[in-house]
């Protein structure tokens, strides 16, 4: 089992995460809340560094984050986990940023 994957964010997924953090900042008017959200998502994704091998054989490569409020779609390569999309769990489909 491999435990040292690199984590790479696709630009679309990264932009969607930033947009959600901006939305949270706009709604809350509190920079700390928006930063905490952004850092919490990044921290959860960083766990794929050592857990990605578990997902390698699964057909659906998505994980819920922050108590299921958000979903991240990813691919597992030989040495890298590619974060390819990010969305709110309320959204039916992945969309463009």
List the predicted regions and their residue ranges.
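Arg/Lys-rich, positively charged N-terminal/basic patches that mediate binding to nucleic acids
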Residues: 1-38
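GIY-YIG nuclease signature motif recognition
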Residues: 13, 41, 74
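Charged, low-complexity, helix/coiled-coil-prone segments
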Residues: 15-18, 53, 57-64, 92-97
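Catalytic cores of transferase enzymes with a strong primary signal for eukaryotic protein kinases
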Residues: 16-22, 29-32, 43, 47, ...
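Juxtamembrane/interface motifs at transmembrane-helix termini
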Residues: 36, 54-56, 76-78
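A short, surface-exposed loop/turn module that caps and links secondary-structure elements
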Residues: 39-67
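Enriched for short, Lys/Arg-rich terminal
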Residues: 67-97
